[in-house]
Design a protein with these regions (language model features):
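A low-complexity, Ser/Thr/Gly/Pro-enriched, surface-exposed linker/loop concept
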Residues: 1-35, 39-93
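Acidic/polar N-terminal loop/beta-strand segments that form early-domain functional surfaces
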Residues: 29, 52, 62-64, 216, ...
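Catalytic and substrate-binding clefts that recognize carbohydrates or anionic sugar/phosphate headgroups
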Residues: 30, 39-41, 83-280, 288-291, ...
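Flexible loop/turn segments at secondary-structure boundaries
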Residues: 35, 66-68, 202, 220, ...
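A generic "cationic amphipathic patch" detector
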Residues: 56, 61-62, 70-72, 226, ...
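Aromatic-lined carbohydrate-binding/catalytic grooves of carbohydrate-active enzymes
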Residues: 276-378
Length: 378
């Protein structure tokens, strides 16, 4: 049963397949086409499979290719010279990227997509998985009645009435991990995950480090290449599937295979960028003021001196957000009530061979003078 206000059009029939030297494109109808008249109505999805990096399959689902792509976009390190292998066999089309491959079934034209690594099935799609979802006009009007701020924080920042949804099968005993820093259980099965940043603390499903990427205990990963809101239903809406959806006429995602999860992460970071190696001291012991505790320079000095007295090596001391004055974050100004001479304090800590880390937030509160400066200068 579909939720009231939505029309769901599933990729039902593989109506036509076109192959080039580096891609396979499938045209999927939302119904079985029995005669020419049935081609006159209903959405047709254009799904392209290609590979721009070894052991990754790039999937692009498009309903209307003329939609304006406004950005922003993730920076990806794709290899324009990489060429997958395209095979046509009696039972399926196949695109091979090193040891990872996708097969598009031919049997009767039914929607049948399978992903493999070194011959082992990773995940698949079948009946009622890929879909184009249309929001009925009355619901769009109702949703857009809120203020701009309300729509933004409700994840609905546009009046786009369409949505693309994909669903990939998961097996019995398969566990899903990822989506960035989350404060729910480590295994994400059974959860609805919104990839949308909020300053929600550490005690709820909200998070400030969201990433539209997950890995499976079956040694594959899925990266949804959309920096906007992405909704994941991890064995929650349908217990045997991971569903993910984005607003608009287009979706792009990558399926990555490997022998181990570490291999999958290697493919992912090759695509999205690998972090630099941090300084050696960052691998040592850190000590923090914690979040809402009351602390000042005397408290900090006591903590550090006690670590030395107990012969506990300390590399980094972290000041949480209250190094700044409350309701002023983040203006990069020390709270002089608690830290009257921060320059001298930091010099003393440096003499003790302690590195310093301070917490920052990606906004400036209204009570800070910098807020007025920002308003004045646009």
């Amino acid at each position: 049963m579909n939720k009231s206000g939505y029309d769901v059009n599933y990729a039902t029939q593989i109506y036509e397949v076109k192959a080039t030297d580096n891609s396979i494109t499938v045209y999927a109808t939302n119904q079985w086409i029995g005669n020419r008249g049935m081609t006159l109505g209903g959405p047709v999805l254009e799904i392209t499979f290609t590979s721009t990096l070894a052991d990754s399959i790039k999937v692009t689902i498009e309903h209307y290719k003329g939609a304006v792509k406004k950005g922003p976009d993730f920076t990806l390190y794709e290899d324009a010279n990489f060429k997958p292998v395209i095979n046509e066999k009696d039972e399926y089309w196949e695109l091979v990227s090193n040891k990872t491959s996708v097969r598009i079934g031919k049997a009767g034209g039914a929607w049948d997509i399978k992903y493999f690594y070194d011959g082992k099935l990773l995940t698949k799609e079948g009946w009622r998985t890929t879909s184009y979802i249309e929001e009925q006009p009355w619901l769009t009007d109702y949703r857009m009645e809120g203020t701009k701020a309300e729509r933004f924080y409700a994840h609905a920042s546009t009046d786009e009435p369409a949505r693309i949804r994909e669903m990939l099968n998961i097996s019995v005993g398969e566990n899903i991990y990822g989506f960035g820093e989350k404060f729910s259980t480590f295994v994400k099965n059974g959860q609805t995950v919104e990839v949308w940043n909020n300053d929600g603390g550490t005690c709820s499903e909200q998070t400030y480090k969201s990433i539209p990427f997950y890995v499976s205990s079956r040694n594959y990963g899925v990266f949804v290449n959309h920096p906007e809101n992405v909704t994941f239903e991890v064995a929650s809406e349908t217990v045997s599937k991971v569903a993910f959806s984005v607003q608009g006429e287009r979706m792009e995602y990558f399926v990555m295979g490997g022998k181990t999860i570490a291999d999958v992460l290697g493919v992912y970071t090759t695509l999205t960028g690998k972090p630099a190696l941090p300084p050696a001291y960052t691998f040592g012991l850190w000590l923090t003021t914690s979040f809402t505790t009351n602390y000042d320079e005397e408290t900090v000095s006591f903590f550090i001196d006690e670590m030395a007295r107990r012969d506990i090596p300390l590399e980094v001391f972290h000041f949480d957000c209250f190094w700044m004055k409350e309701f002023n974050w983040c203006d990069f100004t020390w709270d002089k009530r608690m830290f009257p001479d921060p320059k001298a304090m930091l010099a003393r800590l440096k003499e003790k061979k302690i590195e310093i880390c301070v917490w920052i937030n990606p906004y400036i509160a209204q009570q800070s003078s910098l807020f007025d400066e920002g308003v004045k200068n646009g």
